[in-house]
Amino acid sequence: MALSKRELDELKPWIEKTVKRVLGFSEPTVVTAALNCVGKGMDKKKAADHLKPFLDDSTLRFVDKLFEAVEEGRSSRHSKSSSDRSRKRELKEVFGDDSEISKESSGVKKRRIPRFEEVEEEPEVIPGPPSESPGMLTKLQIKQMMEAATRQIEERKKQLSFISPPTPQPKTPSSSQPERLPIGNTIQPSQAATFMNDAIEKARKAAELQARIQAQLALKPGLIGNANMVGLANLHAMGIAPPKVELKDQTKPTPLILDEQGRTVDATGKEIELTHRMPTLKANIRAVKREQFKQQLKEKPSEDMESNTFFDPRVSIAPSQRQRRTFKFHDKGKFEKIAQRLRTKAQLEKLQAEISQAARKTGIHTSTRLALIAPKKELKEGDIPEIEWWDSYIIPNGFDLTEENPKREDYFGITNLVEHPAQLNPPVDNDTPVTLGVYLTKKEQKKLRRQTRREAQKELQEKVRLGLMPPPEPKVRISNLMRVLGTEAVQDPTKVEAHVRAQMAKRQKAHEEANAARKLTAEQRKVKKIKKLKEDISQGVHISVYRVRNLSNPAKKFKIEANAGQLYLTGVVVLHKDVNVVVVEGGPKAQKKFKRLMLHRIKWDEQTSNTKGDDDEESDEEAVKKTNKCVLVWEGTAKDRSFGEMKFKQCPTENMAREHFKKHGAEHYWDLALSESVLESTD
């Protein structure tokens, strides 16, 4: 018979005990499987088959004990329910079937309101002022309540025994005695004592709860008007005269007393300094305590130790407790930097040792010492020093130079040897020889292509022979249709032609897909174009300097700026009257295109707006002389760039223009352009 979920929950502890008794440990999987068997109403045989994968040899023993546990759980549950039912019936027989008791109780209910009126007439129950309302019950009051409840129960027992004297009867089970006991019968003494204890416990709890409620209401006298009256009446009805309970004084802060000047004083008038407590964090408190602890550890040695002749104050005394070291991770790349620094230092020391050794052999160390000598004072521009700094090393101190030729012994460090300094390679030249690529003829290119295809075809044939790939389909075209297919083409030429055309379309599609895969995307084409324009300038930067007489036309300014940006050129355009200098830096190909722009594409001799209005009164000769043009001043290479992105700078004076070039270390560009402009104007 299948069981409900509630019954399975009640049987689960019994099954767990059985599993632990059989297996020696608890296993939730076996418990769940056993519950499923019991819940589905299986017999012992089916349950054994169901549990055999979990238990193996101990299955039968476990199933027997399982069903015994199930029966034991059912019997205990049934006995518990029957005992509850018998207990309820006995209570009903004792308290519910007595007519006089019911009448008495109904009378009590009917007289509930008059009883309050009687209580109000008694002077002892009338409460005092609201401040004296009852609080929590004391031990004495609880004892009085217990005695009153005991007296009531004793009186009730006497009434019951007076109505019908007790007669001992044999105890029979409830199932064999369905008829109810008569009204006059009494209960057994043990059951009466149990009921009496339950009644006393309930009365005590009710009294405690009532007293607690009254104590809470006493703290708020205006909340419920007659709450005190009702509580006192109930206590009086139980035969307890409640004493007057005084409320405890609530803890209030000490009143603040201020004098005429606003200072805090006590009752005697003495000034009081109040402690001001500021909010702080636990971390700050711990930090202060930590510092105090460190100060205690760093106490000075005692005087008797200092008086010792062997005492050394320079030696620090080790603390009694080791300082706590925090756990700290190293930054990423820290040890790589240290290792690189050590390697660089070792290489530098090795190089210095080699240089010094070579200098001792060749005698260059003397010239090196000469080169390290610098002038001791700053000379003004145009001043001639008495002795050049490279001669000061060989001329001793206090030596007076005269017109007569001094002796050779008067000088220091002069020998018959000639020192040749080591030649250095230029920083921008590349010593690697340039190798020209091998250019093949058409016949050689075809031969090389045939050989490459033959090698690839041979590799495919080897794979087909080894079974690594299937053999390729015959490459059929319309021209070789009859030769390849033969009889199939004769039998159904339409079908064969469709098959051949499908193969041709497939090959065409594969070819186009391969081309599309090799084709660069828009982003890749953009990167390729930028890479092509951004030339390699590691071997040197190509620089060109142009001079334009008039650069006031905004269209020409835009052309210069736009083309410089498109060709990734850097530089500057300095605008000055009759001397407009354009400096551009970049690769050789970009310089070639920009040179063509400046010297050929832009028409500089076109009439500008600035010269049009002012030259009306001038003669034709002056107009011819002031014809606008662009001149290439200088072009060459440098190691690095001097300017950034192309910008225009308006310089009203020559000094301002030269200072701008000097700031970038290229003032010679301005000097060269200005000198050519002056020479041209003089001509």
From Swiss-Prot:
Protein modification: Ubiquitinated. Undergoes 'Lys-63'-linked polyubiquitination by PRPF19 and deubiquitination by USP4. 'Lys-63'-linked ubiquitination increases the affinity for PRPF8 and may regulate the assembly of the U4/U6-U5 tri-snRNP complex.
Residue(s) of cross-link: Glycyl lysine isopeptide (Lys-Gly) (interchain with G-Cter in SUMO2): 139, 244, 252
Record-level GO cellular component terms: Cajal body; cytosol; nuclear speck; nucleoplasm; nucleus; spliceosomal complex; U2-type precatalytic spliceosome; U4/U6 x U5 tri-snRNP complex
GO biological process, one term: RNA splicing
Subcellular location, record wording: Nucleus; Nucleus speckle
Biased composition (Basic and acidic residues): 73-107
Protein function: Plays a role in pre-mRNA splicing as component of the U4/U6-U5 tri-snRNP complex that is involved in spliceosome assembly, and as component of the precatalytic spliceosome (spliceosome B complex).
Quaternary structure annotation from Swiss-Prot or TrEMBL: Component of the precatalytic spliceosome (spliceosome B complex). Component of the U4/U6-U5 tri-snRNP complex, a building block of the precatalytic spliceosome (spliceosome B complex). The U4/U6-U5 tri-snRNP complex is composed of the U4, U6 and U5 snRNAs and at least PRPF3, PRPF4, PRPF6, PRPF8, PRPF31, SNRNP200, TXNL4A, SNRNP40, SNRPB, SNRPD1, SNRPD2, SNRPD3, SNRPE, SNRPF, SNRPG, DDX23, CD2BP2, PPIH, SNU13, EFTUD2, SART1 and USP39, plus LSM2, LSM3, LSM4, LSM5, LSM6, LSM7 and LSM8. Interacts directly with PRPF4.
Protein name: U4/U6 small nuclear ribonucleoprotein Prp3
Taxonomic source organism: Homo sapiens (Human)
Lineage: Eukaryota, Metazoa, Chordata, Craniata, Vertebrata
Gene name of the record: PRPF3
